[in-house]
């Protein structure tokens, strides 16, 4: 039996010119996740895989340091990267393709974060809908297939594998294991917290393909994050 612990990255720099950089809170979230995983896994042999984005690698570094495993080899797999949110939004609202235009639009809202989430939810629904696949640099079926390929490779790296990735790939994994439709998958996506851990189990005979022979052991674990310290974030 193979156990994959899918870790969503810590909080990135929402609203900044460079989103792909952990905030100070995101680093703290990575450390808390490391403390929790360290207590759970003890001295067990682990393999560690990460997407290639800075927020993935930096979350992995903070987590592994807190586990006392700072020297652990990190395998990088770009197939575990997130979809391009800027492209998804721009295809839905071409008038907001420029980052400055998007910031100006959100600045007029009473709650910019809530306004962005509403806009983003509409954009992702369009992206996943299958009616406009040719519009996107990476359409939903292509994204889903590359993520599933990356997860299948990760599952072949050992019996206990930590995977540092984003909400989109975790959504894909849960959808494949539970057989959710796209609307149900999006509900999972929006519930995922920064630093949340989702655990999948795969029989040794099923590791080469995500789906049959896989099961969901836990979803969006947030022990240590959901408390009075303000560590629980969604974006």
Kindly give the residue locations of the regions a language model identified.
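Active-site metal-binding loops of divalent metal-dependent hydrolases
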Residues: 10, 167-168, 220-221
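Active-site-proximal alpha-helix that buttresses catalytic centers in soluble enzyme cores
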Residues: 2-77, 140-141
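Extended, charge-rich helix/loop segments that form flexible
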Residues: 97-134
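Active-site catalytic microenvironments for nucleophilic, acid-base chemistry
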Residues: 36, 40, 62-66, 153, ...
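A mid-sequence, solvent-exposed acidic-amphipathic segment
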Residues: 130-161
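Generic beta-sheet signal
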Residues: 4, 46, 159-165
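Acidic, low-complexity terminal tails and accessory targeting/binding regions
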Residues: 69, 82-111, 141, 157-160, ...
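Short beta-strand scaffold positions
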Residues: 50-51, 145, 164-165
